[in-house]
Amino acid sequence: MADGDIEIKAGFVDTDLDDRKLTMIDDLNNPLAIVERVYLIWWHWADFHLHVISPHIDTITPAIVIEPELISGSNDHEFVYSIHDSGSKLSTSKSQDMFSAGMSMCKLFYTIEKMVHILVDRLKSGGVSMEEEVQIAFAGHEIAQRKAFESIINLPYNVVVTNFDPGIWGEKYLQNVKRLADKGYGYPPESPRENYKHPVSSATTARK
């Protein structure tokens, strides 16, 4: 009986392996499955780029790397990724945390808030008025672009994103904003925001 049991179990194992091989082959031949997996990988190291088209901003070569700064009054650094500053272009990505961050976009969103803050500081130092039209363009992961768009439309400056169509997502976003406002929760805070300067360790301790 014991030998028979072993043979049966071995047969199950062989069948299971064969099924998995067939599934794997089907996935490799399925364009949609491949696209889905590539998108999932991209989500883990999502990047974002902000280009200033107009007004003209001088290019910085080589790019300056802006590291997370120490937050005043604490031992924590800003909860952001490194930002590569090329003058007219700001770039960042989750690549340094791709294995630990997983699909979380929290740190990237805070980094985007800082990039928008840098953009505004650059406009102020360049003497650009709030009424003057500023044209920018996005590149990178779709979710990161949506976050940047949300921050940009809440700026007091006349900033226009030339290559981003909010589409159905934009309509739903505005509907949700209005619904929350009608319930008394107010509207999103004006940009630029400094929420990325919130000490991470103290927030974690408070939750515990």
UniProtKB/Swiss-Prot annotation:
Predominant place of localization: cytoplasm
TM region positions: none
Function: Component of the Dot/Icm type IVB secretion system (T4BSS), which is used to inject bacterial effector proteins into eukaryotic host cells. Part of a subcomplex which recruits effector proteins and delivers them to the core transmembrane subcomplex. Is a critical subunit for binding a subset of effector proteins. Recognizes more than one type of binding motif. May be a critical factor that confers host specificity. Necessary for full virulence of the bacterium in guinea pigs and presumably humans.
Subcellular location: Cytoplasm
The protein, known as: Type 4 adapter protein LvgA
Species for this entry: Legionella pneumophila
Coiled coil segments of this chain: none
Disordered as annotated region, ranges: 184-208
Alphabetical keyword list: Cytoplasm, Protein transport, Transport, Virulence
Subunit structure: The T4BSS is a complex nanomachine composed of several subcomplexes. This subunit is part of the Type IV Coupling Complex (T4CC), a subcomplex composed of the DotLMNYZ core and the IcmSW-LvgA adapter subunits, linked by the C-terminal tail of DotL.
Listed GO biological process terms: protein transport
Record gene name: lvgA
One Gene Ontology CC term in the entry: cytoplasm
Disrupted gene: phenotype observed: Shows attenuated virulence in guinea pigs. Mutant invades alveolar macrophages normally, but shows slower growth than wild-type strain. The mutant is twofold more susceptible to killing by human beta-defensin 2 but not to killing by other cationic peptides, serum complement, or polymorphonuclear neutrophils.
